[in-house]
From Swiss-Prot:
Belongs to the PurK/PurT family. It catalyses: N(1)-(5-phospho-beta-D-ribosyl)glycinamide + formate + ATP = N(2)-formyl-N(1)-(5-phospho-beta-D-ribosyl)glycinamide + ADP + phosphate + H(+). It comes from Xanthomonas campestris pv. campestris (strain ATCC 33913 / DSM 3586 / NCPPB 528 / LMG 568 / P 25). Gene3D superfamilies: 3.40.50.20, ATP-grasp fold, A domain (3.30.1490.20), ATP-grasp fold, B domain (3.30.470.20). This is Formate-dependent phosphoribosylglycinamide formyltransferase. InterPro entries: ATP-grasp, ATP-grasp_carboxylate-amine, ATP_grasp_subdomain_1, PreATP-grasp_dom_sf, PurT, PurT/PurK_preATP-grasp, PurT_C, Rudment_hybrid_motif. The gene is purT.
Amino acid sequence: MTTLGTPLSPSATRVLLLGSGELGKEVAIELQRFGVEVIAADRYANAPAMQVAHRSHVLDMLDPQALRALIAQEQPHLIVPEIEAIHTETLVALEHEQGQKVIPTARAARLTMDREGIRRLAAETLGLPTSPYRFVDTAAEYREAIATVGLPCVVKPVMSSSGKGQSTLRSEADIDAAWDYAQTGGRAGAGRCIVEGFIDFDYEITLLTVRHAGGTSFCDPIGHWQKDGDYRESWQPQPMSAAALRRSQEIAQAITDELGGWGLFGVELFVKGDEVWFSEVSPRPHDTGLVTLVSQELSEFALHARAILGLPVGAENGGVIRQSGPSASCALLAHGNGVPVFDNVAEALRDPDTALRLFGKPRVDGHRRVGVTLARAGSIDAAREKARVAAAALTIQLRD
């Protein structure tokens, strides 16, 4: 797709975002730069991407009839899933029946909507190294899986994100509570889980991998720190050996080639020395990649937009994704109930090498990521400290 029309006209190039969170918002902004007509959909009103789209829709995207009706109404040239909670079988059917273009492919969206599809593809079809694992449906199977993979281990619902329903088990005392949490924390409610054995890794990375008209390109590896399964900080580049980087790129190329299509993929990997294990892959921009808003000339969102439109990403003919130096991000979390209000914004931006993105989440109920601070410096450690200082300067209030 190298011809682009004018939005809100008969020539418009229409893109439907299925999911309208903070990552979708940045993708929408990048698409708008190319005059693309953006339609944003999610299960709640005033989601971040809706605030920068030409129009929006609120629906349950797990409802096949509602999803079909939306696509029939909007007639998009591209459907861009931005979350996992979508009735992906409908996308597969529409791709087959009508030639509907799904990014990167409907099959990729279906395989990555839960942990089982992508884990079986990676480990059993492609033979990629992974942690030991078992899938379970009942409490009895869960206990058998723990006995097989051993402690410590991790249990996660097959359908969840941002650490919801995820627990680390270090002793038998953790077993019952972890199962109960997994049955209440997943997107689909009680159900199937994965039990994963622990890998004694040195660090974990996200390797942003771009499939585009000119081939496959890699961003510098992104290191990150998680708490309770949710991203809290990320930085780029993550130092690693040449052998580990080469192996990481081989694994990322294998899984993204199998998924196919164009767009950006977030490939998560565990690294110990020169050894690398596959963890997960998202066929879309990744939350740890928010750091690329300052660390790269083209952010992960700009790369995704360009790739899906068939435009150059600046790394053709053996080139590389250009970096801007050591950079870091720090997530802003709000806890409680209400509409977020941010104080001390000027203080947070006092350092000229810092930046801030407030996502525009309409409300917080419980805890929610509502923004991110970003920083550049002469070293990763210095950039991380700057991002933390900026985050600490902000005060987040929740008002009714």
